[in-house]
Amino acid sequence: MKEGDIAIASLRQADGTIKDRPVLLLRRMPPFQDFLVCGISTQLQQSAPELDETITPNDPDFRTSGLKAPSLIRIGFLAVLPRSHFRGRIGAISSVRLDRLMSRLSEFLRPKKV
């Protein structure tokens, strides 16, 4: 698996339960080859427009994503997961979308000037 892939992984939810969910692999983390991931959800109404991005069947990379329904790529729902938490790869997003999401995350994490 590599950055930009969408995989199924065991991910802790806000209520503390662990569920197998689609995740986007954002960055491989040294030294143990864990991955920084963000969750993917079909709950479009939970969108945080300054962070999240919707992917729909009208998007050129939807088919290659492996997702089955319009979904939110939730940049604000981050986790670092070991390889053992992944059940397998289902697809990938375009490099253009990955770059845009990484820029959005980087900008969000940058200190705000007061």
What are these regions (language model features)?
Residues 1-114:
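Conserved functional hotspots at enzyme active or ligand-binding sites that engage polyanionic ligands
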